[in-house]
Amino acid sequence: MHLTPHWIPLVASLGLLAGGSFASAAEEAFDLWNECAKACVLDLKDGVRSSRMSVDPAIADTNGQGVLHYSMVLEGGNDALKLAIDNALSITSDGLTIRLEGGVEPNKPVRYSYTRQARGSWSLNWLVPIGHEKPSNIKVFIHELNAGNQLSHMSPIYTIEMGDELLAKLARDATFFVRAHESNEMQPTLAISHAGVSVVMAQAQPRREKRWSEWASGKVLCLLDPLDGVYNYLAQQRCNLDDTWEGKIYRVLAGNPAKHDLDIKPTVISHRLHFPEGGSLAALTAHQACHLPLETFTRHRQPRGWEQLEQCGYPVQRLVALYLAARLSWNQVDQVIRNALASPGSGGDLGEAIREQPEQARLALTLAAAESERFVRQGTGNDEAGAASADVVSLTCPVAAGECAGPADSGDALLERNYPTGAEFLGDGGDISFSTRGTQNWTVERLLQAHRQLEERGYVFVGYHGTFLEAAQSIVFGGVRARSQDLDAIWRGFYIAGDPALAYGYAQDQEPDARGRIRNGALLRVYVPRSSLPGFYRTGLTLAAPEAAGEVERLIGHPLPLRLDAITGPEEEGGRLETILGWPLAERTVVIPSAIPTDPRNVGGDLDPSSIPDKEQAISALPDYASQPGKPPREDLK
């Protein structure tokens, strides 16, 4: 084949041409799709071997949208390899270490490293988006295989930004290169099997944000067969892309992609994203606060007319950027918000942004503060400045697992843990949204249907949560996220109450806006996996009692704060019961709207008992909570 100037620089930079002439490299071409569809052995003694990876150009030029899945199995026995895929990506295998390097800027490549668990065969996979308004990056991941050719370990899913030219090349006619890398073998070879490319396609839709909403999460595996089965098993969840890929068609385009049985326990699926221009904390916060795809904020160009992005995403991203630019510590968030609201005209652009939407600002800044605090705590040498631009590792966590830990090399990244959310259980009907007029398109019938589905999936109702409108939207659609709290350890967590009247008092704005208005909020229903109920405890002490902290630690078996446990006690002496969930437990909850309305004419008033629908009251019984320790102290939480 002919080496074009487009990819000569990459090949040279990798050392792929070292020790061999330009012409000899051109003579060592092979046909990956045909020769290696079943199995092939490449002789690497003379330097570079190369193969075009052509696909039907009509696929990339279609008016639809889709994903190309390239894959091949590299057999064990040769651990010293260098591979390249055009100018886009290089892969170096050196013993147990696989290094990835690539990106849109040759002088500033993104680098990732993965340590294999064994020296057996492994499968190289990369996903290329195609079609209308596609994302601007590819995904790369490794599947390790055991002696029985079963999937035994999976790397994180790595994101590498690409320019339009490179993406187009990868989708049509990329070139694959391979050579031995510092091999001690006299006759180095490489065995490849099951090389192939498949595609999933669907007709274009006008709302790009929905089509690509899972591109930056572990759920991207749900797009393709057989990766959807891998996702379902590892995450112990169900691939559910709603109607975003309705009518999608999957087919093999060339070669013979492998399908592997699984020999792996349900485990975390991790997805690592690098933000070339920094700003990852601001992007992660906007993603969480506004329930917008994280992939959105890695793009250089955004679709026009995206209301949620313009009304929430951009303002939140700008707000966090302003806070960072002011060089304020994240433990000052509450005071900064109070000062901005108490003194109109103060605080510059940051103060103005807070006053424009105070509750959205409170939600966003407390989320960002919690992420920064967790980042600083999780790695030696991490600091608040590093949190602003660290990589993001999105973790899809098995529901029934214990602590959801990131990969060993993720201590320098912002970690986002993802569990099922209320959005998956809302059923058919109009879009759900929260306003002072009530929860739009939500009915008692939809509530009952959601409740039944949750029970079938192993969830149990544990109480109500009252909050302001922006938080309700974020919690139902994006899940509960830890927020910073300027409180003693015993009070830190997510608050719920079995009595809706108690939660009702919190269903309002926390602060008045610039005109002194406080809006009514929303009541939500909180469900936890039934398997987590042994971690629920009850005490007769008020949590304000001096001896309460010691009593709670005795019950939960580890020092405060709460983690995968909860404590229920009276809000005051002789008062109603409230429950605090530890943030790691709260992240596992599924939260859906209640059908109990809040009254915009009586904000801060008492709940009218007659407003509670009989059918909702009938499904709101609480489980029993333990009042004595039911398990030994957790060593990992001491």
From Swiss-Prot:
NAD(+) binds at H465, G466, T467, S474, G479, V480, R481, A482, R483, S484, Q485, E578. GO terms for biological process: symbiont-mediated killing of host cell; symbiont-mediated suppression of host translation elongation. The active site is at E578. Disulfide bonds join C290-C312. The 8 cysteines participate in intrachain disulfide bonds. Pfam families: Exotox-A_bind (PF09101), Exotox-A_cataly (PF09009), Exotox-A_target (PF09102). Residues 596-638 are annotated as: Disordered. This is Exotoxin A. The gene is eta.
